[in-house]
Amino acid sequence: MTPEDYLKKRLDPEQFEKIKGIDNPELNEFLAKYIELLNPARVFICTDSKEDENYIRRRAIEYGEEKSLAMEGHTIHYDGYYDQARDKARTKILVPKGVEIPFINTMDREKGLKEIHEIMKDIAKGKELFVCFFVLGPKNSVFTIPAVQLTDSAYVAHSEFILYRKGYEEFKRLGREAKFLKFVHSAGELDERKTSKNIDKRRVYIDLEGETVYSANTQYGGNTIGLKKLAFRLTIKRAVEEGWLSEHMFLMRINGPNGRKTYFTGAYPSMCGKTSTAMISWENIVGDDLTFIVDMKGEARGANVEKGVFGIIQGVNQEDDPIIWEVLHSPNEIIFSNVLVKDGKPYWNEMGIPIPDEGENHSGKWWRGKKDSEGNEISPSHKNARFTVSLDAFPNTDLEALETPCGVRVGGMIFGGRDADTWPPVREAFDWAHGVITMGAALESETTAATLGKEGVRAFNPMAILDFLSVHIGKYLKNYLEFEKKLRIKPKIFAVNYFLREKDGKWLNHKLDKSVWLKWMELRVHGDVDAIKTPVGYIPKYEDLKRLFKEVLNKDYSREDYEKQFVIRVPEFLAKIERIEKIYRDVGNIPEELFKVLEEERHRLIEAKEKYGDYISPFKFL
């Protein structure tokens, strides 16, 4: 029986007609294989119609995966108590036998496929399977990557309708030409709260060769929303093979003088200020998480892979996050997950207002002081609780930039690290290679706040991409360095660090100071201000920052603060070079240029140290 004949026999006539309209034998083969394997009771094919999207929304409520909240458009979804985050241990990249890739959890492909197919046999029995079509990047553009998602979770399908552009018509347009990504998900057997029961059989297997991701016995978005971090592994591999960049970066517009618009991307590890930077209220957001960057006629053009936000809700409060707060308290289409609900209203940790003493949360019925089976007190919401919302709900979204098929020109790229004592608040690279290597490839995040006499642990996280790499880091960096050669106009590269501390542990910067660094970077992209050359890159002049602090924040900025923040800390910089160099030497197969650029930086620092000492005032470089 041909795949088409099987589908005709297995699907309702109305659903079969939807598939027939696409005319793609590879798609038919894929659907036939996995509908037979998962063995659902019924199959629903989603087109781009509003009716089909509404059907998914309705099913999420009817199947008990979501419940309506008091405000129109708001729903709550709960994942299982032990299904609240990405499962790093059971997320594996399937590779040919004997292949190992540094930093990556790999598994023999044949063995992995055999295991996941056994786990998924009949896993959707008695359930409804949804087949959804989406695209990554703007439609009908150089960025477009079509993708098909099979899932028996209406919550997962609903999330994807909020986060991604619909792709059924794009599949029809491309027909047999479509080079598409594939995602197969089942939540598995559900308990009485409609959460995945067999967590011991939770698996997330990424088959690079087949460009397919399998996800079983889990509901948490990071493990199940195929087009997010699962697709990201596949697009990183594609980008490296095809010579473009698939990055873990926000994309935002910084508004310069006289209505000038300049677009920046930014890669920051978790807890380093990525979302708060992208959401500054007087600038404009294009995307908060994933960006494709391609060469178009010698320009680096960027596009948001997504059209929505799957954001961490903990700590979102009215004072620090006015825009997100407003969005979450308006009648938008929002899925809240793993927060506390009382009388139809959502509450979360550190929201800055009183939280009820009881209600329902990810642990079931909750009361203050409730403990789990290990004796840990359960907080009102999970620390990884989320909100899922479309970007068009945000008043400061640059909607034109979000959907333009040719993307936006990237003027600057920002790498945001976190340390108490090394990187100054903002600096600019000398050139592309210097930025890629000493800023992007050397990105670290201090995991604990440094206290007196005790240093935080610095997690190495180049380009904030380590968790998602699907190729050798050397290959990934080589592609980055090669990409520059295609460009006539090169984005400037910057590094930021919002977390410097004084010796007594006090922060050296206020939360909103970052908005000044952004304005300075925007001016530098256009050559509107000069900068001071130091051994580690260009830093701002005091006079320029003094003026910008007044203009942007209406704050006085003292010479003393400037000096404390922008002092070049030579011993700390040298120690960092040592750390980064060792990591890459141990890994092997790294472009030689990386070691050359690090050595040049070391040489400049030692020279400056001999002249000015260990801690060099920025005024010394004038």
Swiss-Prot record:
Cofactor binding annotation: Binds 1 Mn(2+) ion per subunit.
Pathways involved: Carbohydrate biosynthesis; gluconeogenesis
Required co-factors: Mn(2+)
Cellular component, GO annotation: cytosol
Residues annotated to bind GTP: 271-276, 386, 418
Keywords assigned: Cytoplasm, Decarboxylase, Gluconeogenesis, GTP-binding, Lyase, Manganese, Metal-binding, Nucleotide-binding
Biological processes, Gene Ontology terms: cellular response to glucose stimulus; gluconeogenesis; glycerol biosynthetic process from pyruvate; oxaloacetate metabolic process; propionate catabolic process; response to lipid; response to starvation
EC number per UniProt: 4.1.1.32
Biased composition regions of type Basic and acidic residues, renumbered to the chain: 360-374
Region ranges (Disordered): 360-381
Alphabetized GO MF terms: GTP binding; manganese ion binding; phosphoenolpyruvate carboxykinase (GTP) activity
Catalysed reactions listed for this entry: oxaloacetate + GTP = phosphoenolpyruvate + GDP + CO2
PROSITE patterns with a match to the protein in the record: PEPCK_GTP (PS00505)
InterPro entries the record matches: PEP_carboxykin_GTP_CS (IPR018091), PEP_carboxykinase_C (IPR013035), PEP_carboxykinase_GTP (IPR008209), PEP_carboxykinase_GTP_C (IPR035077), PEP_carboxykinase_GTP_N (IPR035078), PEP_carboxykinase_N (IPR008210)
Main location group: cytoplasm
Role according to the record: Catalyzes the conversion of oxaloacetate (OAA) to phosphoenolpyruvate (PEP), the rate-limiting step in the metabolic pathway that produces glucose from lactate and other precursors derived from the citric acid cycle.
Family stated for the protein in its record: Belongs to the phosphoenolpyruvate carboxykinase [GTP] family.
Protein name in UniProt: Phosphoenolpyruvate carboxykinase [GTP]
Gene that this sequence comes from: pckG
